[in-house]
A protein has these predicted regions:
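H/E-rich (His + Asp/Glu) clusters that bind or coordinate divalent metals
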Residues: 190-192, 196-293
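Hydrophobic faces of well-ordered beta-strands that scaffold small-molecule active sites
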Residues: 5-7, 74-76, 96-99, 125-129, ...
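A structural motif corresponding to the C-terminal end of an alpha-helix
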Residues: 64-74, 91, 153, 185-190, ...
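Active-site gating/metal-coordination segments in enzymes
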Residues: 73, 80-173
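Distinct, well-ordered alpha-helical segments
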Residues: 84-89, 108-117, 138-143, 168-184, ...
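Mid-to-C-terminal alpha-helical segments outside catalytic/metal-binding sites
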Residues: 2-10, 14-68, 244-247, 258-293
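Active-site environment of divalent metal-dependent phosphoester hydrolases
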Residues: 12-14, 82-83, 104-106, 134-135, ...
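Glycine-enriched alpha-helix->loop->beta-strand junction motifs that scaffold or abut catalytic
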Residues: 122-126, 146, 152-156, 185-189, ...
Length: 293
C-alpha cells in the first residue's frame, strides 16, 4: 500500500465541543450575496456536496478510514489552532499542526510569541501564512518576524500561493512572485508554496527550481486535471517528474473537491510520473520537509 502525507485534510467538524470551525461562507462580507469570501461558497458548493464528509461523532471511524487508504499523516485545513491542537492530542502522530497566525489578529511580537507557544507547548510542526485571509502578499515585511521565528524554531512555513476567489480583494495577492523575495531574504527557511501557484504554475515551477529552500504542494486541485493537456499544469508534471521531483507535495483536499479519498489517490497514481516520483510526491518529500523519519 502507498503511504501518503496529505497537505490539506478536511477533518469532520466537532473535534472539540467548545470550539467549532467556520466554513468559508461564514466569513463573508455583509451585503451583496456571493461577494467576498462568500464567493467561495458559490464556486465550490457543488464540489463539497459530494465529498467525504462524516458526522463529528464518527471521527474515530474517519481516522480508521484514513489509515485504510494509506494516509499516515495529515495537515488539518480550516480549523482554529485550538481545534488542531485537540486533534493532535486525541490522535498522536496522525496530524501535523499548521500554526495559522493572522497578523490582523496577532500584531507584532504577539504573533511571534503565539507561534513559539504553539510549537513548543502544543507540538505544531509548521507556520501557516495566508494572503487570502490577511489581504497582504507574503513578502509584506509585517510577516518577517514570523518568518524569523519559524527559521529559528526549525519549522517550515506554508504560504498561500494561488489566485483567490474572494472578489473583494486583489486576485493576485497569492502570486508566486511574492515568494521570491521571502526565499531570498530567508535562505534557511523551508517554504512551501501552497495550492501549486495556479494559474501561475510556470512561475511557481521556475521559482521552485531557482530556490533550494522553496517547495510546492498541489492542494485544492484534482490530479486528474494536472495531467490533462491544456490545463496549465504541464510544466509541473514535466519538471515535477525530473528537476524538481524532490520538491512537490500532495494535498488531496477531499472536502473541497468533493471526492472520496480512494478516487483522489488513484488519480495521483495514474499521473504520467515515474513510480519513484509518485512515492516522493505522496510521502517522501513531505516527510523530509517536516522532519518525519
Amino acid at each position: 500500500m502507498v503511504r501518503i502525507i496529505d497537505m490539506e485534510c478536511s477533518v469532520p467538524y466537532g473535534v472539540n465541543a467548545e470550539s467549532k470551525p467556520e466554513k468559508p461562507e461564514k466569513a463573508a462580507a455583509e451585503g451583496q450575496p456571493g461577494y467576498g469570501m462568500a464567493n467561495y461558497g458559490r464556486i465550490f458548493r457543488a464540489r463539497r456536496e459530494g465529498g467525504d464528509h462524516r458526522p463529528a461523532e464518527d471521527l474515530d471511524a474517519y481516522m480508521k478510514h484514513l489509515a485504510t487508504v494509506g494516509i499516515v499523516r495529515s495537515v488539518p485545513f480550516g480549523l482554529p489552532n485550538a481545534e488542531t491542537a485537540a486533534l493532535m492530542t486525541r490522535f498522536p502522530g496522525r496530524f501535523i499542526g499548521l500554526a495559522r497566525i493572522s497578523i490582523n489578529e496577532h500584531h507584532g511580537m504577539a504573533g511571534v510569541r503565539e507561534l513559539e507557544r504553539l510549537v513548543r507547548e502544543e507540538g505544531f510542526g509548521a507556520l501557516g501564512v495566508s494572503a487570502l485571509v490577511d489581504c497582504l502578499p507574503a513578502s509584506d515585511r509585517r510577516y518577517y518576524p514570523l518568518y524569523t521565528k519559524a527559521a529559528e524554531l526549525g519549522i517550515p512555513v506554508r504560504i498561500y500561493s494561488s489566485m483567490n476567489y474572494a472578489n473583494d480583494r486583489p486576485y493576485d495577492l497569492g502570486h508566486p512572485r511574492h515568494l521570491d523575495q521571502v526565499a531570498m531574504d530567508f535562505p534557511e527557511l523551508r517554504i512551501i508554496g501552497g495550492l501549486g501557484g495556479w494559474p501561475w504554475v510556470n512561475e511557481m515551477v521556475a521559482l521552485v527550481r531557482r530556490h533550494p529552500n522553496l517547495h510546492v504542494d498541489t492542494s485544492a486541485h484534482r490530479a486528474r486535471y494536472l495531467g490533462q493537456p491544456g490545463s496549465g499544469w504541464e510544466m509541473l508534471i514535466q519538471f515535477g517528474n525530473t528537476l524538481i521531483q524532490d520538491k512537490v507535495r500532495v494535498g488531496l483536499s477531499a472536502g473541497l473537491v468533493g471526492q472520496p479519498y480512494e478516487t483522489l489517490i488513484q488519480e495521483y497514481l495514474a499521473l504520467p510520473l515515474k513510480d519513484t516520483v509518485k512515492e516522493k510526491w505522496l510521502y517522501g518529500n513531505a516527510a523530509r520537509v517536516f522532519g518525519i523519519a
